[in-house]
Amino acid sequence: MENIVLIGMPLSGKSTLGREISKILKYDLIDTDTLIEKMEGKSIKEIFKIYGEDYFREKELEIINKLKKESNKVISTGGGLPIYNKNIYELKKIGFTVYLKVPLEELIKRMVKKGEDTRPLLKNNDTKFLEEMYKNRIEIYEKAHTIICNTNHEESLITIVRAYKKWKGI
């Protein structure tokens, strides 16, 4: 499949970079969390509160299975999607996976700046929880086809598009 799949921690810039990449490549943007919200008619926060995390992860798996038929898309995943059910391997079948690696200190700054957030796993700006999440997820994220270690938006954008074109053989 010829898709770009963006993975990484919450607040790593997946949605923002996804929008820009989709404009450059003239690909449709798919945000997995937004798709789940539309399917369920509820926000992610409400889904977690009413049905729990396991239910939400089942919905993510449904989304992955639907995406296997897609091509020429930029897919921005929820931060936990690659982690559960060995989804990282399924995502790599869907397209070129890009891990947006942002230093923990920068993620904490972004979380504090944003304040109370709609992300259910980042409630109450719990920096210790974010730190644990980071440590637990990094090994799986690093299985992506490429890793972008840059907090500069424009440089990241250029690097991702170049790496994708190289992967695709353009």
UniProtKB/Swiss-Prot annotation:
Keyword Cytoplasm tagged: yes
Stored Pfam families: SKI
General function of this protein: Catalyzes the specific phosphorylation of the 3-hydroxyl group of shikimic acid using ATP as a cosubstrate.
A GO-annotated cellular component: cytosol
Entry protein name: Shikimate kinase
Subunit structure: Monomer.
One GO MF term attached to the UniProt entry: magnesium ion binding
InterPro entries: P-loop_NTPase, Shikimate/glucono_kinase, Shikimate_kinase/TSH1
Gene3D superfamilies: P-loop containing nucleotide triphosphate hydrolases
Residues engaged in binding substrate: D33, R57, G79, R137
The organism of origin for this protein: Clostridium botulinum (strain 657 / Type Ba4)
Main location: cytoplasm
Gene transcribed to yield this protein: aroK
Names of the cofactor(s): Mg(2+)
Stated family: Belongs to the shikimate kinase family.
Lineage of producing organism: Bacteria, Bacillati, Bacillota, Clostridia, Eubacteriales
